[in-house]
């Protein structure tokens, strides 16, 4: 049995939905279909999820939502019209969305989650109706009825372990199951969403619970590429990745697959196959425990901007018990997550995403670090990009860090920081944002000019 997930671009129009139908109908093993909300039909289009977020914001302010409401309905109606379906399903979606907009707003986070989740939920209902219209035995199932329980962390929910046993019952259902992605239910019966693009997570959770043999993730690219095609033209396709490699690359900027979605698949040992809805015959990329193709030490290079660094220096820091704990406590008090923390005997650097800082947060953090740690220096640097060089087999190859550093030096890129974990799956380089693309191209040319991945 396979669990198959379709992203928003694969479900953005009636033409796309018919491609999805063909893919499901041609393979009887594709029993559970996890769906996103309708995505972009063209470059400057607006995703349904974004329309719903804007609609929710207006509703919370008590403003008129009618225009945005109709824009959302029009997206579903356009799909129904393109596929020849009746207005019955659209009337159902209209009533559902109206009820959601009119629901309790005393807790804005819960209200926003209900609004966002309606995008996937109503699309699942529409797709199940379309499959039936085309003659398939297909049924929509609500995550609550399926037993998908999550934590009460709105916009960052985590699956509860008991969900997996409950979801196993999906194997016994007849026909095709259409399952909305992106959200689950708390034990109190409230909707709680995963982080953005969380339908990937739903697919992996359902695949784990149903003990699927394969989790297929259909998107709008032929494969995972060794580097961002917007930075390097015609990059090499990656035919096979390990879970750890994909996790590192997804975290560091690869948008093809949500990094959190790998965890349920990894725990169950379920291979993930990333494929293109618009070109299903393409080989795609498989994510597995161990990859067979080891022709190169580096499998991919990913980059992301929007980071800052806090450098803390104090003589004899290494002898001071609890110094690191005090640093992390100050961050925790401010509600900040840190990404990396490379250190020496007398200094350490904290890497943080800049979008976490409010108007006064930076000043408060800097003051506390200086005063409470009695540090010699505390310096914040903005505009940092992180570049991850990733490959499980790097640990078996001497000189990878040296080659990478030389490639950056030859390209006149200054390395602001470098970090490598003990697992040696990845090497992190910090560079100025304006040098990010130059750095990525230099590293790609160093490791992929003669390599087939």
Give names to the regions the model predicted:
Residues 283-453:
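A conserved regulatory-domain signal marking ACT and ACT-like small-molecule sensing domains
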Residues 271-283, 305:
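Active-site C-terminal subdomain of aminotransferase-like
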Residues 29, 136, 270, 336, ...:
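Short phosphate-binding/catalytic loops that engage adenosine nucleotides
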Residues 37-39, 183-184, 278, 316, ...:
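Active-site-proximal loop/turn and secondary-structure-junction residues that shape catalytic pockets
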Residues 146-147, 222-223, 280, 346, ...:
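Positions that flank functional sites
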Residues 1-258, 262, 430-432, 451:
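Nucleotide/pyrophosphate-binding catalytic subdomain
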Residues 214-218, 272-274, 339:
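Short hydrophobic alpha-helical runs that function as membrane-insertion/retention elements
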